[in-house]
Amino acid sequence: MNKKEPFLATPYLQFNREQWATLRDSVPLTLTKEELIDLKGINEEISLEEVVEIYLPLSRLLNFYISSNLRRQAVLEQFLGTDGQKVPYVIGIAGSVAVGKSTTARLLQALLSRWPEHRSVELITTDGFLHSNSVLNERGLMKKKGFPQSYDMHSLVKFVSDIKSGSKQVSAPVYSHLTYDIVPNEQKFIKQPDILILEGLNVLQSGMDYPHDPHHVFVSDFVDFSIYVDAPEKLLKSWYISRFLKFRQGAFSDPDSYFHSYSKLSEEEAINTASDIWQEINGLNLRQNILPTRERASLIMTKGTNHTIESVRLRK
């Protein structure tokens, strides 16, 4: 008698690329090749095929969830006998440095805004809620940028709380990747969008990740649907090094760049420097603080080589 395979219980439905692609149904492609080029990151070769097979099914799923959420709000308003406030639907996107969170966020912003409902979609990154370099220097945390202790979590939580409370206008600080710092006296104003996409390393973290700064609510408490963009660390490191080399020839050559000195490195020196930064900062942060949040996500997208999505896990 053959022994039965052990049943592995999982809170996720699992799809390979082909299975996920069939869930597109008849959703039309609303992006042109030229628009896609503008949306992709510096180190990513994303194709229209990837948009069709991965992101159109995802935008269809999100549209169902958002419509369901609006119906739930209408039921509550009917019960209370009120008109109610407009409360944005918050989508969180998390994952490692260099995994392509920003491209995923920009793609979803473009696709969701083009559904027939013409919903307004805003995008905010949690980089704006990092402490300024002056504060990080004072606290000896410049080499811990992106780690939990480098964020002004009270301000970030208040921002998301105000968004979900229906505030008519909420402001967020602006971060510059050129100067590697918060831009003084600059704010981005969010005015009750239908959807807010919040992208950052830390959107799935909870209070247990911040023992040094305890508080009762967290960003993840206000996120309606969360996406974790995953990839093996070996790939992440190679993508980071490749991106570093491209920045060395591009953004780092700007005299105003915080990393201007890196533009003078030879290719071998640049590879070694990027590898050291990964080992000492980004890889460490991934293993300690980012990867442990993966299973909190509503959906996990796992990438293989060339940034292509190979599998999707959707929470039941």
Swiss-Prot record:
Main subcellular location of this protein, as a coarse class: cytoplasm
Catalytic activity: (R)-pantothenate + ATP = (R)-4'-phosphopantothenate + ADP + H(+)
GO biological process, one term: coenzyme A biosynthetic process
Gene Ontology MF annotations: ATP binding; pantothenate kinase activity
EC number: 2.7.1.33
Matching CDD domains: PanK
Keyword DNA damage: no
HAMAP family attached to this UniProt entry: Pantothen_kinase_1
Protein name, as recorded: Pantothenate kinase
Organism: Photorhabdus laumondii subsp. laumondii (strain DSM 15139 / CIP 105565 / TT01)
